[in-house]
Amino acid sequence: MNENLDPTTKGYNSEELDLEKRLRPLSFDDFAGQDQVLENLKVFVAAANQRGEALDHALFHGPPGLGKTTLANILANELEVGIKITSGPVLDKPGDLAGLLTNLDERDVLFIDEIHRLSPIVEEYLYSAMEDFKIDIMIESGPNARTVQINLNPFTLIGATTRSGLLTAPMRARFGISSRLQYYSTELLTTIVERSAGILKMPIDLEAAIEIAGRSRGTPRIANALLRRVRDFAQIKGNGTIDLEISKYALKALNVDAHGLDEMDNKILLTIINKFKGGPVGLSTLATAVSESSETIEEVYEPFLIQEGFIMRTPRGREVTEKAYKHLGKINTNIQGGLF
């Protein structure tokens, strides 16, 4: 996937990250989509505020770029508390987690992205913090070592994951709130594109906003990334306004087709068709064939390809669908051969 369109923020420079933050909604009122999730969260937050308690621990899961981090920040804003942000792979040992937990004020939010990647020892250390707001800390070492129990301020842990199936049952059970985020419709993404263009002070036509939204893989983060790149083309190759013509020109230059598939998406489909006769093919074999990691294919590319009906998962591996053949202008010889 084009680095600028990757539905993670990896590869973003400081300016891109600053723009990303500027475009993020800061309150429930600014957040578009995920209506049922949002309505439930409003109730939970209002109740917690009314009681003066910490919000129950919450888990957000779903494909990348749908608003998990944004919702964590919104919850902290709506609760009027502080938030500390970290990620599973960063927390190598219990001491890393203890440093964060002991510095949380009452009702603060601790957000752990990629929580499914916590090491088992750190995860187990988190259990007592989540349940009893207590942790054990080892004092000194050697024969003088002893354990001291420390009381924590009541806090809210918000976990985000793209792979909820990798969470252990004990961890999943400790979240009182669990919400799955869904892909966005073109209509909602159009609203998001128009809002973001307004923040960037960039004139945009409705037709252009619809075009960008339709190629954004149902993902707000990608919609905003595409908008920023189209803005560059409008500024240098156009008249400063994002219209339909410059949008199509820019999206073609970015190798983003009418379905929102980019170069790697189409490479995955073509590889399954040309090298594996349409499939089935195992994930690791496919990853080697397209020179991409299995994890990236499974987390970033595959969910949308399955959602849009280009790929099927079967017990024997991945297979492309008839829609993929038509999209790429290929003939499915497997079907033809079965007719004679």
From Swiss-Prot:
UniProt lists the gene as: ruvB
Which SUPFAM superfamilies does the entry link to?
P-loop containing nucleoside triphosphate hydrolases, Winged helix' DNA-binding domain
- The protein here is known as Holliday junction branch migration complex subunit RuvB
Alphabetical UniProt keywords:
ATP-binding, Cytoplasm, DNA damage, DNA recombination, DNA repair, DNA-binding, Hydrolase, Nucleotide-binding
Q: Where is this region: Small ATPAse domain (RuvB-S)?
A: 185-255
Q: Which HAMAP family match?
A: DNA_HJ_migration_RuvB
Question: Which portions of the sequence form the region Head domain (RuvB-H)?
Answer: 258-340
Q: Which one of the record's GO molecular function terms can you name?
A: four-way junction DNA binding
Q: Which GO terms describe its cellular component?
A: cytoplasm; Holliday junction resolvase complex
Q: Which family does it belong to?
A: Belongs to the RuvB family.
| Documented EC number(s) | 3.6.4.-
Record remark on domains: Has 3 domains, the large (RuvB-L) and small ATPase (RuvB-S) domains and the C-terminal head (RuvB-H) domain. The head domain binds DNA, while the ATPase domains jointly bind ATP, ADP or are empty depending on the state of the subunit in the translocation cycle. During a single DNA translocation step the structure of each domain remains the same, but their relative positions change.
Q: Which GO terms describe its biological process?
A: DNA recombination; DNA repair
Residues annotated as binding DNA: R313, R318
Q: What does this protein do?
A: The RuvA-RuvB-RuvC complex processes Holliday junction (HJ) DNA during genetic recombination and DNA repair, while the RuvA-RuvB complex plays an important role in the rescue of blocked DNA replication forks via replication fork reversal (RFR). RuvA specifically binds to HJ cruciform DNA, conferring on it an open structure. The RuvB hexamer acts as an ATP-dependent pump, pulling dsDNA into and through the RuvAB complex. RuvB forms 2 homohexamers on either side of HJ DNA bound by 1 or 2 RuvA tetramers; 4 subunits per hexamer contact DNA at a time.
Q: What does the record give as the reaction this protein catalyses?
A: ATP + H2O = ADP + phosphate + H(+)
The organism's place on the tree of life at top rank: Bacteria
- Organism expressing this protein natively: Flavobacterium johnsoniae (strain ATCC 17061 / DSM 2064 / JCM 8514 / BCRC 14874 / CCUG 350202 / NBRC 14942 / NCIMB 11054 / UW101)
Q: Where does ATP bind?
A: L23, R24, G65, K68, T69, T70, E131, D132, F133, R174, Y184, R221
